């Protein structure tokens, strides 16, 4: 047993220039771990609390000095002396210390930084790569990536309501090949947009952010880009998209108000529109198609489309086993998006992934729109054999860093590495 001897946190910046928490953990045998916490733009209302200072004289109120002080003070005092390899004890100690159901006192950003840095310190001390330390000898599945190539909604300053349009190289034979296919399609898409006189400026996650005539046009453009890049839509590369529907849902009128279409939709009408898109285009995954509190609407949506496509709950589940358990019992969605900072500790993240798998739901490990150079999620997705990752486009170093780490991991695993492609959708029997 080697104990934690020191913890230090500081305020650094994320990819949007907003402050975030970085923590370092040191052990008595020389282990060292560093982790930086990401942050989201479209956040679920049930997420764990990201503690911000609110001091308008610093970073427009977005500073995190209080969270940093919580790490360097209360958390350090409680965690120093604990066995660095006892992740569950470290995380539970912080949960108990916080004492709130949503980590609102110490901040999920403070707790997650320590949780992740502790795991890295333990891996460093044992001389193991992080994915092997977290997942053991069975960690071998490389994820099928969701590559966000067209941005809309809160991730871009354009008129597209749907937040993310993604390509998934389901026909690739390896992660390396998947990255190449994605990059080729991304660059082909750029040329296509330029030909059409559209903007090729990129959004928060590295995808292009053009103004388009409606919410269906991006699907048409993606199909053409995939074909021009030399691939078959639906066979080599499929399409995934994230509505982030809570962001354009009017709670008073109970309608989905779209800018691109200039229309308002009831849940029934919006579901029918999504069904038409699935029938018309090579779509394999839809995230947050309805408002996060419309559980009955989600149930109907799942009944109508659940055997055709992966239906991912992000704002709906917020990486929380309580909400996931409710969804499983109701038959809502068939997949969960996993975001470390939605729940705040590594232990609780593992619990959510495990619960999803046991229920036959897939788990998609995800970045946030405000990212950093930290690559923990690349190791996490391999450690858990989750099979899918959502980590942005083929641009911006904060996104590419994760792909580069995954390629390193695939190389290190050698012949034991497995890229499942279409078979990572084990919740969709009709795909095989």
From Swiss-Prot:
Catalytic reaction annotation: (2R)-2-phosphoglycerate = phosphoenolpyruvate + H2O
Cofactor remark: Binds a second Mg(2+) ion via substrate during catalysis.
Pathway: Carbohydrate degradation; glycolysis; pyruvate from D-glyceraldehyde 3-phosphate: step 4/5
One GO cellular component, as annotated: extracellular region
Pfam families xrefs: Enolase_C (PF00113), Enolase_N (PF03952)
Record-listed Mg(2+) binding positions: 242, 287, 314
Chief subcellular location: cytoplasm
Active-site residue numbers: 205 (proton donor), 339 (proton acceptor)
CDD domains noted in UniProt: enolase (cd03313)
Keywords annotated in UniProt: Cytoplasm, Glycolysis, Lyase, Magnesium, Metal-binding, Secreted
EC number(s) recorded for this UniProt protein: 4.2.1.11
Classification via PROSITE patterns: ENOLASE
Matches recorded under NCBIfam families: eno
HAMAP family in the record: Enolase
Family: Belongs to the enolase family.
Function: Catalyzes the reversible conversion of 2-phosphoglycerate (2-PG) into phosphoenolpyruvate (PEP). It is essential for the degradation of carbohydrates via glycolysis.
Protein's recorded name: Enolase 1
